[in-house]
Amino acid sequence: MWDSVLGHEQNKEFLQNFLQREARPHALLFCGAEGLGKKKLALEFAKTFLCLNGKGDDGCEACRLLNFADGNVSHPDFILVERLPEKRDLSIEQMRDLAKQAAFAPVLSKNKICIVEDADRLTEAAANSFLKLLEEPPAGWLIILLASSEDKLLTTILSRVVKLRFNPLAVADVKKLLLARGVAENESEVLARISEGSVGTAL
């Protein structure tokens, strides 16, 4: 499952088991350096999580509304919070908007999922506002935080999430992805070795 995401097999196994559980944690933290595939796996998982047949294989209406490759994302139960282009951090206004959305139940799928990118870039006020959402999570919600470092996250936030660590990829995995994207053999070898296990760095 999620073969488009290279490596991170332990995290994939956790997420596969997560889907089978009745009692689930309401918040996960994907933590690791930039370019390791945290967002990619979060998006692929979101598609499966919201899928009406549990496969995430584009076979249902929910999947068709989460076409990340084409930028066609209109699923009413999917929320992505990311820094605005002109902003350095995630703002309290964004967290307040998220809190307002928490009042609404799932529309199409059984659950709702919210991915918060750059969660380690929350302002202090935004972090405290977000903490209230974690303390009283809406029914049927799953929140996934993406962060490069947990050091900048409030300890009270860390205590309310299940952490999945993303480690650097093997050189062979980085090279495989580069080749799949049309990079020449010799160049792929060099880029993979200097990438420090980060596809983002290699590209």
Question: What residues fall within each predicted segment?
Answer:
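P-loop/Walker A NTP-binding region and its immediately flanking N-terminal helices
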Residues: 1-118, 142
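Non-catalytic interfacial helical region
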Residues: 6, 13, 83-203
